[in-house]
């Protein structure tokens, strides 16, 4: 079973990432306190710990996952080619809208990181909120192939 390991938000572009132990998630604004939450297909971004570690192994570097600037870190999950599937985290349901493409900003964190994140969805997935609620570090995470529509 996959677990939510970490939650990060930022209140503006290029702002420092801020750790949260728990956060409210809504259809209107994504993660409370995160400025990207109003983007229709990219309200929440998710990275898998093992994918992040694979990228770092290729680089031979040790870089904190917060350098990815994604919102959620989960473990024991394969997000590759999961567009349209749903992630269930606690009571929250997210629909995966696509792969998160690693941006040039990754090179600022570590030379070569952008290319190391490119294969196999290592940079993570972008999601939209289907069902809001509260999530907290330690919540179980489940990937399902169902197709759901936002209800709020």
Language model: regions and residue ranges:
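Metal-cofactor-dependent catalytic cores
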Residues: 1-152
């Amino acid at each position: 079973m996959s677990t939510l390991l970490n939650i990060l938000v930022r209140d503006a572009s290029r702002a420092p990432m801020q750790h949260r132990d728990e956060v409210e998630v809504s259809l209107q604004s994504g993660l409370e306190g995160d400025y990207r939450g109003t983007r229709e297909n990219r309200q929440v971004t998710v990275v898998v710990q093992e994918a992040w570690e694979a990228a770092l192994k290729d680089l031979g570097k040790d870089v904190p996952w917060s350098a990815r600037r994604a919102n959620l870190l989960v473990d024991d999950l394969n997000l590759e080619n999961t567009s349209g599937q749903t992630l269930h985290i606690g009571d929250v349901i997210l629909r995966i809208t696509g792969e998160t493409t690693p941006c040039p900003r990754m090179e600022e964190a570590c030379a070569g990181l952008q290319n190391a994140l490119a294969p196999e969805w290592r940079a993570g997935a972008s999601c939209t909120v289907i069902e809001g609620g509260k999530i907290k570090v330690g919540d179980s995470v489940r990937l399902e192939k169902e197709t759901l529509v936002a209800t709020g």
